[in-house]
């Protein structure tokens, strides 16, 4: 029996999204009796988000699905300052044009999880630059700044960590906490927003906004955070051996995204199915009973369902079929990731280590060399034992490609161009 009566909090609870709530009973009552507006903030520091952001995105997804209104708040204003939370050094400052380009790109990612066009409870994307860029500094200090205690701000873990390490914390970054708190108050005044959600590392910042709202006369505001997500082996979500796992197919092919989830550790399959898919809980309970070799089927279901939300069902099933042909039939699948190498270079010959790095299967020649020495590298299914081997047009198959493999699960087609 769930401790919550509202559909939204009950869904988050049974799927493992909840770490901390500022007023559990009060927030549950609010969700049970009215349509609630809530937001999560994102600083547009890149043109795409990665899988480390998926927990919060899915919280917004479930909010809309249970009849409430989610806001994805773009930090067009705060992004010009940079969040100092648990960072070892100041972030590189971005121009307005860079930030706006990133926001445009991010909306395409969010649109796969949220519906901005529906008639009832449409999702909103709001840019805090709309109010932050026009602030009068003296009025802001007088009306907002006076509510903040520097002593208290210095006690926050995110600040203390920097200061304890004797790392510089600029006045610019220090202001970030005030601006983020003000966002909550401004959103309440503009949209009636009552809840801010985020990762557990944002708890202090969110409580700041609640306190500011109380001092400035808003209705009761609430905080809800999700746990810091790591794999069962302790690895942080969002990165793979080959780099960030982006939510933008221009940065990461659909097949690679699918494969990332297919490689989930056994102990994480059920937890990730709850968090990152919309599978019914009874279907997830069935998956939880799978063991032994059946766990691989569960991983394929997980990979296909997560990929279908982001890239569409057809693309997800195509990726699954590509994997099946590659691994189960040993066939050459045209939908494998590919790179182009000028024919002139192949005529002259390309070193295998260089080719591995260019294909994104290793980050350096040293890593590529270790793959060769470990017997993990194959060209057209033939093992490579010599790190000095030269790859040329002679290796191009009748299909017009060279299949480069590292291990059993990483394959790239090299196409002469």
UniProtKB/Swiss-Prot annotation:
Gene3D superfamilies: HUPs, RNA-binding S4 domain, Tyrosyl-Transfer RNA Synthetase. Keywords: Aminoacyl-tRNA synthetase, ATP-binding, Cytoplasm, Ligase, Nucleotide-binding, Protein biosynthesis, RNA-binding. Its EC number is 6.1.1.1. A motif ('KMSKS' region) lies at residues 236-240. GO terms for biological process: tyrosyl-tRNA aminoacylation. Residues 350-416 form the S4 RNA-binding domain. The keyword Amino-acid biosynthesis does not apply. GO terms for molecular function: ATP binding; RNA binding; tyrosine-tRNA ligase activity. A motif ('HIGH' region) lies at residues 44-53. Its main location: cytoplasm. It holds the Pfam family tRNA-synt_1b. It is found in: Cytoplasm. GO terms for cellular component: cytosol. ATP binds at residue 239. The keyword Transferase does not apply. It catalyses: tRNA(Tyr) + L-tyrosine + ATP = L-tyrosyl-tRNA(Tyr) + AMP + diphosphate + H(+). It is an enzyme of class 6 (ligase). It comes from the Bacteria. L-tyrosine binds at residues 39, 176, 180. Belongs to the class-I aminoacyl-tRNA synthetase family. TyrS type 1 subfamily. Catalyzes the attachment of tyrosine to tRNA(Tyr) in a two-step reaction: tyrosine is first activated by ATP to form Tyr-AMP and then transferred to the acceptor end of tRNA(Tyr). PANTHER family: TYROSINE--TRNA LIGASE, MITOCHONDRIAL (PTHR11766:SF0), TYROSYL-TRNA SYNTHETASE (PTHR11766). Homodimer. This is Tyrosine--tRNA ligase. It comes from Agrobacterium fabrum (strain C58 / ATCC 33970). The lineage of its organism: Bacteria, Pseudomonadati, Pseudomonadota, Alphaproteobacteria, Hyphomicrobiales. The gene is tyrS.
